[in-house]
Amino acid sequence: MQFGVHLPHFGPFVSREGLRRFAQRADALDFHSVWASDHIAWPQHIDSLYPYTTTGEWPAHDPWMPRLDAIGTLLFVAGCTERVRLGTTVLVLGYRPPVQTAKLWSTLDVVSGGRAILGVGVGWMREEFEVLGMPSDHRGARADEQLEIFERLFAEHAPAYAGRFYRFPPIGFEPKPVRGRIPVWVGGHAPAALRRAGRAGDALHAAHVSPETLAGQWAEVRRHCAEAGRDPGAMELSVRLGLDYAGTSARPNALSGEREAMLARITEYAAVGTSHLLLDITGDSVDGLIRDMERFADEVVPALTH
């Protein structure tokens, strides 16, 4: 199993130095990947329900909390690391025009030496779409078109597109990603998201779900993959979970407790088919996050990677 960690790019302790130290330590500890989440503007009042808590309340809602841009964060981290992969958990496709998004990602992939992972989702906060001046209707259909556009921009010499929501004439789009394309990890748990993952993704990137729920989602993704004429065996399964040694996380299914309890729980996810685990570490300082990352790397990772 491979392990990734969420970068400390939001919260009261955001800083250039803290971000650099955390990312470089993750790189040195041989974590597979580091990840950034995508929010741009936080309305003071939100009626939209957050899909990953039982109450629908968003644990991170604080309009004045410092938050660095996801792609800008990854570009910075690309410049101060050498090996670790760089992903979004997840990039909300509807927040940006697709050609602009593709340019940002091809840039990240080139300057990082081919380390980008494009984790995508359709978003849930209607109010943020409104603040950004972007439509929030038909989010799934728009996302499907965006993924088609990315494929063309990354592969074709003079790509063009004419869809229901997006269109552009033949254009030049260079440089291409280092390996010709960027892996797409599809987030979400709705039936449409699972269908999208199976038909257009390289991985399902689930979040805060139990092994039992994940098993059902994974079966659906593999079914859609086969129906689309793709190889389900080539798909990857990733799940994002809290890592909370203090036992204070508000997120469901967070990993907590001592080493043996964590190993047993992670083994349940592995039995479902999980090949990648993204750790969302709970803490109140960068030093604390690094200590917990080091502890996990020392106590848990060796038992699951050898």
Language model region names:
Residues 1-306:
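Active-site-adjacent structural elements that line small-molecule/cofactor binding pockets in enzymes
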